């Protein structure tokens, strides 16, 4: 109907689509933003990146997209601040990297959790800082009291009491999922984090196609018909062979003498003097170079034939 807007289906949250969005954002950030003309584009791009990452994250942890985050009641009462600590089981799993699992590459996993739950998620306590020397220097200083505690995740939220309790409960459930170690090779969240890190570094490649050159060659092979050809014979290079003898051979002269010595009836002319029969009389001299001495001689059909039926000279001679 007229006036209705056509709603297009949103692209599926795939790693390739996320990589395209990341590349677009990187390209847009490199362009000069005169008078804020890209503000709306940047906002839409950030929203799409957030949607794709959210769907991929939910598919990874829950198996399907969770829609409960938008189901919040209306605010009732004043703003309240709630918080809860979840201690990391580092004593039970001393070799497991819980901090990297919670934060993700460049903090993307923690930011995704914050966007979904509406809570502030921070890693605190011993071992929460990457720089161990800096952690020891800050221990005991003001605002660094948490370094004296065991490693934990601090979840805080500010909202009305009824809404804050729902948000905090959801955040605690999501963080508890991250505190359960997965077997090596079966950690889907870790695979997603490594994929995101490769996208950010520009080193992500599709696992189905190893390289663009290989994909192009496979497509060309599938479309082009296959032609079976026989083996190519090994022959000497024709360009290196002398196209014609460098000097006239004795064959035309012998044929001319033999023809003139015969009568019309086929009998020898009485006045004709035939060449004496010597061992050298049957030799035809072909002056080829030594490397081509074993090559077959040029066929006599390559020489011109005059009107009398006698083979002509290979090269014209001066009369």
From Swiss-Prot:
The keyword Acetylation does not apply. A motif (SH3-binding) lies at residues 276-279. Residues 87-153 form the KH domain. Pfam families: KH-I_KHDC4-BBP, STAR_dimer. Transmembrane segments: none annotated. Keywords: Cytoplasm, Developmental protein, Differentiation, mRNA processing, mRNA splicing, mRNA transport, Nucleus, RNA-binding, SH3-binding, Translation regulation, Transport. GO terms for cellular component: cytoplasm; nucleus. Its main location: cytoplasm. GO terms for molecular function: mRNA 3'-UTR binding; mRNA binding; SH3 domain binding. Coiled coil: none annotated. GO terms for biological process: mRNA transport; negative regulation of macrophage differentiation; regulation of astrocyte differentiation; regulation of mRNA splicing, via spliceosome; regulation of translation; skeletal myofibril assembly; spliceosome-depend formation of circular RNA. The keyword Ligase does not apply. InterPro entries: BBP-like, KH_1_KHDC4/BBP-like, KH_dom, KH_dom_type_1_sf, STAR_dimer. Disulfide bonds: none annotated. It is found in: Cytoplasm; Nucleus. RNA reader protein, which recognizes and binds specific RNAs, thereby regulating RNA metabolic processes, such as pre-mRNA splicing, circular RNA (circRNA) formation, mRNA export, mRNA stability and/or translation. Involved in various cellular processes, such as mRNA storage into stress granules, apoptosis, interferon response, glial cell fate and development. Binds to the 5'-NACUAAY-N(1,20)-UAAY-3' RNA core sequence. Acts as a mRNA modification reader that specifically recognizes and binds mRNA transcripts modified by internal N(7)-methylguanine (m7G). Belongs to the quaking family. Homodimer; does not require RNA to homodimerize. This is Protein quaking-B. It comes from Danio rerio (Zebrafish). The gene is qki2.
């Amino acid at each position: 109907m007229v006036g209705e807007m056509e709603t297009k289906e949103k692209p599926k949250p795939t790693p390739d689509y996320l990589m395209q969005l990341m590349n677009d954002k990187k390209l847009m950030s490199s362009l000069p933003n005169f008078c804020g003309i890209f503000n709306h584009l940047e906002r839409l791009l950030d929203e799409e990146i957030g949607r794709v990452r959210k769907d991929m994250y939910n598919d990874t942890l829950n198996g399907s997209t969770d829609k409960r985050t938008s189901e919040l009641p209306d605010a009732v009462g004043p703003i309240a601040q709630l918080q809860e600590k979840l201690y990391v089981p580092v004593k039970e799993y001393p070799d497991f990297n819980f901090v990297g699992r919670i934060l993700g590459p460049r903090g993307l996993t923690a930011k995704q959790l914050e966007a979904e739950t509406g809570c502030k998620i921070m890693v605190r306590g011993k071992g929460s800082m990457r720089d161990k020397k800096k952690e020891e220097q800050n221990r005991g200083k003001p605002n660094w009291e948490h370094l004296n505690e065991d490693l934990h995740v601090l979840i805080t939220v500010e909202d009305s009491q009824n809404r804050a309790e729902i948000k905090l409960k959801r955040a605690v459930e999501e963080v508890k999922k991250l505190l359960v170690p997965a077997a090596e090779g079966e950690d889907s969240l870790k695979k997603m984090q490594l994929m995101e890190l490769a996208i950010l570094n520009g080193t992500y490649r599709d696992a189905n196609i190893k390289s663009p050159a290989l994909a192009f060659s496979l497509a060309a092979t599938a479309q082009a018909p296959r032609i079976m050809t026989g083996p190519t014979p090994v022959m000497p290079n024709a360009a290196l062979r002398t196209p014609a003898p460098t000097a006239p051979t004795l064959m035309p002269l012998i044929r001319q003498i033999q023809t003139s010595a015969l009568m019309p009836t086929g009998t020898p002319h009485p006045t004709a003097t035939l060449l004496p029969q010597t061992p050298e009389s049957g030799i035809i001299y072909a002056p080829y170079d030594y490397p081509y001495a074993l090559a077959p001689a040029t066929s006599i059909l390559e020489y011109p034939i005059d009107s009398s039926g006698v083979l002509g000279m290979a090269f014209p001679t001066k009369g």
